């Protein structure tokens, strides 16, 4: 029983190679079935995302090259192309790597939480194919508890490191409750969709989506029960907005100083937060000069993100310490299991020898042999049988010039205690 992790990721391989080595839904089941039938593999879990492909296995001794060969053959990629980008971890290093990955310590965005869900899905997919053996079952369950511990004891995922999330975090800091706030979203692209998801997750239920094309805005609005307006209608609705978040591809500003000034008068100068994450700007810079208007640009958000990344790096130090501690503890537990198996096998072998010699001795007694002679012969044979393997091990260690091994065997047999 030996743990093995092989893979490629965004650190080691180009997008082109990662695409070639990915296990899509159409390939995954077949791959797990092949690994289950592989002579060198006891169990396997395959993790395949846009940034990494990794195969975790419980393997027989010396299976490293066989699993690499299998990966090469399965994807029909030459070893000369695959190997330079491939990393291989064994035993405790494999345990530590899986735990680091699951905690977001090896992610493109440090501390991102999505990877844990992807690892859980990979484990679930492998269980569906009955590819997870007892060792991997224990490893993945332990990994999930370690990831939970890292999230609980550190703040590695608590600081915004995406523009969309940073915009929502800023809004939460300025307004006491997003549940009571009305948000105007200008644009309906990917960034605004992410913003809407974060806002919705934080209790915001009053959203207005303004976009050039109504169809795209409707698609977004349906997800969050939002109102849809055109860009031309923004002046009529701006006064309703406590928060404005804008991200379009417009070459010219959409929201001007005069428009905001009018809206603030209608709001009786209740504060308005405007977050402009478009390049070029959607909101005129002069809006920031108005009292009660708080304008933040993508550059302002980037400084927040940079600061948060540094904070995550600090939190990662503690997370790494937790992973080191937990991976070492799991490896110790795994080794203790291996010792239990060895002890069981050794005891079984000794019992088989005893039963065999006892049967022969009883037959001799039944045939009328001298009991004393039978007992002496039994004790001699039992001694010779039981010391044969240790004696041979001592001889080999001495012949091969391995004093350290010789010392270990002597200690195991308790010979030094007899002096």
From Swiss-Prot:
GO terms for biological process: protoporphyrinogen IX biosynthetic process from glutamate. It comes from the Bacteria. Pathway: Porphyrin-containing compound metabolism; protoporphyrin-IX biosynthesis; 5-aminolevulinate from L-glutamyl-tRNA(Glu): step 1/2. NADP(+) binds at residues 187-192. InterPro entries: 4pyrrol_synth_GluRdtase, 4pyrrol_synth_GluRdtase_dimer, 4pyrrol_synth_GluRdtase_N, GluRdtase_CS, GluRdtase_dimer_dom_sf, GluRdtase_N_sf, NAD(P)-bd_dom_sf, Shikm_DH/Glu-tRNA_Rdtase. One of its GO terms (molecular function) is glutamyl-tRNA reductase activity. The keyword NADP applies. The active site is at residue 50. During catalysis, the active site Cys acts as a nucleophile attacking the alpha-carbonyl group of tRNA-bound glutamate with the formation of a thioester intermediate between enzyme and glutamate, and the concomitant release of tRNA(Glu). The thioester intermediate is finally reduced by direct hydride transfer from NADPH, to form the product GSA. NCBIfam families: hemA. Homodimer. Possesses an unusual extended V-shaped dimeric structure with each monomer consisting of three distinct domains arranged along a curved 'spinal' alpha-helix. The N-terminal catalytic domain specifically recognizes the glutamate moiety of the substrate. The second domain is the NADPH-binding domain, and the third C-terminal domain is responsible for dimerization. PANTHER family: GLUTAMYL-TRNA REDUCTASE. Belongs to the glutamyl-tRNA reductase family. This is Glutamyl-tRNA reductase. It comes from Vibrio vulnificus (strain CMCP6).
């Amino acid at each position: 029983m030996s743990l093995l992790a092989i893979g490629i990721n965004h650190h080691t391989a180009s997008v082109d190679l990662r695409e070639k080595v990915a296990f899509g839904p159409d390939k995954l089941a077949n791959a797990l079935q092949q690994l289950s039938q592989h002579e060198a593999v006891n169990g396997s879990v395959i993790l395949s995302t846009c940034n990494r492909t990794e195969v975790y296995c419980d393997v027989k001794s010396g299976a490293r090259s066989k699993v690499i060969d299998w990966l090469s053959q399965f994807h029909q990629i030459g070893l000369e192309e695959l190997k330079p980008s491939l990393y291989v971890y064994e035993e405790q290093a494999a345990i530590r790597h899986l735990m680091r990955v699951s905690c977001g310590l090896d992610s493109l965005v440090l501390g991102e939480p999505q990877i844990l869900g992807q690892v859980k899905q990979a484990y679930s997919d492998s269980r569906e194919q009955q590819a997870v053996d007892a060792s991997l079952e224990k490893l993945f369950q332990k990994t999930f508890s370690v990831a939970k511990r890292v999230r609980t004891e550190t703040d590695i995922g608590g600081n915004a490191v995406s523009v969309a999330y940073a915009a929502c975090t800023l809004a939460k800091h300025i307004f006491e409750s997003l549940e009571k706030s009305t948000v105007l979203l200008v644009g309906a692209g990917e960034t605004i969709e992410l913003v809407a998801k974060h806002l919705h997750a934080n209790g915001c239920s009053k959203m207005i989506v303004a976009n050039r094309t109504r169809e795209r805005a409707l698609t977004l609005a349906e997800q969050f029960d939002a109102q849809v307006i055109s860009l031309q209608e923004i002046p009529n609705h701006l006064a309703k907005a406590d928060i404005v978040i804008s991200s379009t591809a417009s070459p010219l500003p959409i929201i001007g100083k005069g428009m905001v000034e009018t809206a603030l008068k209608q709001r009786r100068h209740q504060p308005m937060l405007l977050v402009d994450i478009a390049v070029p700007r959607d909101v005129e810079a002069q809006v920031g000069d108005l009292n009660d208007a708080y304008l933040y640009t993508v550059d302002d958000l980037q400084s927040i993100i940079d600061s948060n990344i540094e904070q995550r790096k600090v939190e990662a130090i503690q997370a790494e310490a937790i992973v080191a501690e937990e991976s070492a503890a799991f490896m110790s537990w795994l080794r203790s299991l291996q010792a239990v198996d060895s002890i069981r096998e050794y005891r079984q072998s000794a019992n088989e020898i005893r039963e065999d010699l006892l049967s022969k001795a009883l037959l001799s007694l039944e045939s009328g042999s001298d009991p004393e002679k039978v007992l002496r012969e039994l004790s001699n044979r039992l001694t010779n049988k039981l010391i044969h393997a240790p004696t041979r091990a001592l001889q080999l260690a001495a012949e091969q010039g391995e004093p350290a091994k010789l010392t270990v065997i002597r200690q195991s047999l308790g010979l030094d205690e007899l002096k």
